[in-house]
Amino acid sequence: MKNIFAAIDLGSTNCRISIVAIVNKKPKEIYRFSKIINLAKNLAFNNEFGNEKIRLTTKVFKKLSKKMAEKNVNSYKCIATHACREAINSEELIQNIYKNTGIKVQIISPYEEARLCLYSTLIHIKDHKKFNMIFDIGGGSTELIFIKNKVKIKNEFEFLSLPYGVISLNEKSELFNKSKINEEIK
């Protein structure tokens, strides 16, 4: 039996999956998919996912579930980031996904988001003995990760998580502009 794993990222902008098979003791990606869902859209205005957003996200997860079955995935990890941390009805979305697909979604902390970003980035940094800073600019938040020395253990970094991503910053600036305009009119 092959070891086949899936990683699913339910982000503020995209929902992504990577399915990997272990071939000759090395990971080989056998499937990748990404769908723009803009989960964070309108969160700045009402702080919840609309019914249509929940329906569309669940539809994407149905496709992911089907693909995981086709590829005989043995194990998976599904994480959700900023949008699900912020929305007041994220549990409704997560339960709907599970009910319709059997996929369990885990909302991760900003620390865990930064840690995962760091370790997925380290393979691309040639000399991380020097000081490095990594920016992870998402749809709902931005993580700044600081590393000073060669990272040997999972806690050897500092990070800052800002609630400003591509979508959230745009919407927050719209809120500010509308209130400023209304103030000027008065």
Task: List the predicted regions and their residue ranges.
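Gly/Thr-rich phosphate-binding beta-strand-loop-beta motif of the actin/hexokinase/Hsp70
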Residues: 1-30, 121, 127-158
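Short, glycine-rich nucleotide/cofactor-binding loops
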Residues: 9, 53-54
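Short glycine-rich, Thr/Ser-proximal phosphate-binding strand/loop in the N-terminal lobe
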Residues: 14-51, 150-183
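A short glycine/small-residue-enriched secondary-structure motif
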Residues: 33-40, 70-75, 93-99, 112
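Glycine-/proline-rich flexible loop or hinge segments
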Residues: 40-50, 73-81, 104
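Short, well-ordered amphipathic alpha-helical segments that serve as non-catalytic structural scaffolds
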Residues: 55-67, 184-186
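Short beta-strand-loop/turn "lid" adjacent to the catalytic site in phosphate-handling enzymes
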Residues: 65-95
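Active-site neighborhood for divalent-cation/phosphate handling
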Residues: 77, 86-87, 94-142, 147
